[in-house]
Amino acid sequence: MLKRNQPMLLERMGKMQSATDVAEYCKYDGFDGLKRAISLSDEEILNELDVAHLRGRGGAAYPLGKKWRHLYHAKGTTKYIVCNADEGEPGTFKDKVLLSEDPLSVIEGMIIAGYLFSAKAGYIYMRGEYRRIQKTFQEALDNARQAGFLGENILGIEGFNYDITIISGAGAYICGENSALLNSIEGKTGRPRVKPPHLADVGLYLQPTLVNNVESFASVPVILREGGQAFLEMGTADGGGTKLICLSGHIKNRGLYEVNLGTPLEEIIYGEQYGGGSATGRSLKFIHFGGQSGPIGAVATLRDCLYSYEDLWAHDLSVGSGAIVVMDDSVNVVDYLVHVAAFFAHESCGKCTPCRLGTTRILELLSKFNRNEATASDLPRLEKMLTHVTRLSACGLGQSVAKPMKSALALFPEEFETTAETEIYATSKGGW
């Protein structure tokens, strides 16, 4: 029976002698979720996922049960399972830990998906910089295959033939977008597709395809092993289970933690078992949630906020990838955003003009503020550019560029207006 504050995804870490050894994995409930899954009907498996209310852990927070049910009813005799392990989000390192320290949990989740959808092939698209982790994961795949959990007639079930292949990325952030990732697997340029159609209908090689994040796949065996209701009760009504969070920035205890959804944000930031408060002794100023594309929140306004999907959404924030970057009051938010904008300008794939040119113009404008060279017209120009890029970009990268900028503008307008006001004053007075 699961208990609140009991780790589910990090429970084996530090206990197993070898992260890739199947026998060690099985000592700690490994493959119990798969064994229960094959004892259930397809509808019972889907019902457990619906009850668990696991939201996708890659950032979009789409209910996993709905996604799996969509694929289950999709037309097509060939279906593919794809794990998105292209973890390129700055400030996010949770998938890296799961892949290196408990790879068999991810493999088990992918096998359960393969069983449910009668898939023959699964792919894990792993960040190119994770060369060492790719070797570890390949060793885990080989061991699982040798133990009879991959290959032909898995667990003695006639016709249950399924295997997983590692695909290495080449360091492009845009390939974290699911359709761009599938294009890359197919050997094409990693650029997003036009939607619809949904990937569950027309995905890899134009066949129905399931794409889930590493943490999402690792959570599936827990749901099947413990039951959807038990998983739901570990979180909140709007999002079950626990969430891996990555604490970084001006915070004392930087690192990876597993928290129950619904944990007070103040406890995460200041509690000694988690963040431990400011590392510099200065007051904490703002938090960047969910990766570079996530919104920014002021610490002072979040004292009563819970770390849950519904509560963060109510504050115009988001869980996103689980990244939590904390900055103290020595940081000017414009200085911080210049680095965020530079990241987006560099990683834009260039397919659509609004993102290709818009991210560059946003960086140029923020750099003007940063150099104290902005004029009174630059602030409305920046706001207009943010709106255009959001509305006209073809994929989620361009559509989310404005989130940190707009939230920072709303919270700290004085830090953007200072240089513009200085310009007006200097002009009206004829110089200093």
Segments the model singles out, each with a brief description of its role:
Residues 102-116:
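Histidine-anchored nucleotide/phosphate-binding helix
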Residues 32-48, 77-79, 85, 94-99, ...:
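Ferredoxin-type iron-sulfur electron-transfer modules in oxidoreductases and energy-metabolism complexes
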Residues 109-113, 260-279:
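Short amphipathic, charge-patterned alpha-helical segments
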Residues 25-31, 83-95, 199-204, 246-251:
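Gly-rich Lys/Arg/Thr-decorated short loops/hinges at beta-loop-alpha junctions or inter-strand turns
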